[in-house]
């Protein structure tokens, strides 16, 4: 990318890296680290026209959330914290990543785009 003086890097973080989670300190710390890496690398690579961003999904329908979704009480508790009232779909996260990789986001760098149905809004 540096030889081409162009490109885009997209990291996958998590909204947990922004708000923390009980019993999830290591995971939260790793995702917070990605957020810092995103911003620092964006500043470092911007002179080479390389953009660096991250997407931070909230709960998404996936293998990672399968146990929580199978436990009705836990699932309803999680949904109560999401203003949009549902888990995200993998395709929704992929759409954001595709946008960040495209020229449509040519003036966006150093950002962590949160896609969590409004969870971190309150």
Segment roles from a protein language model:
Residues 18-24, 29, 46-47:
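Active-site "substrate specificity/gating" loop of NAD(P)-dependent dehydrogenases
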Residues 14:
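Residue(s) in the substrate-gating loop at a strand-loop-helix junction
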Residues 43-47, 106:
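Alpha-helical segment proximal to the catalytic Tyr-Lys
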